[in-house]
């Protein structure tokens, strides 16, 4: 994926914020020798996270904002191991709704259609996105 200059600046700002916060991802980047992202080459050096990385951060080790900014907490089911707990800010929830709305639009769904959300999602991470995007 080729990033434009604005995207590189946005990624750089996020990486620097995470490094400053000492969060889970800040530590991942620090250990990988990442100090910022100013080029496509820098972007391509960003490490991936595995499911085990996220499980090892249980319960709220991936939280990168102050507690008072967390408005929802969702979880994976934990059926294949320790659940992954994901805290969301209000902006995260809004962005998630927009992303799902775009998915519905791409699928050809309009305001004349009805959507049935069948999973018993409870705290399932994607459940609220399905609901809010509708």
What is each PLM-predicted segment?
Residues 1-75, 80-98, 102-106, 110-112:
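Nucleotide 5′-phosphate-binding alpha/beta core
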Residues 105-134:
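Conserved AMP-binding loop of ANL adenylate-forming enzymes
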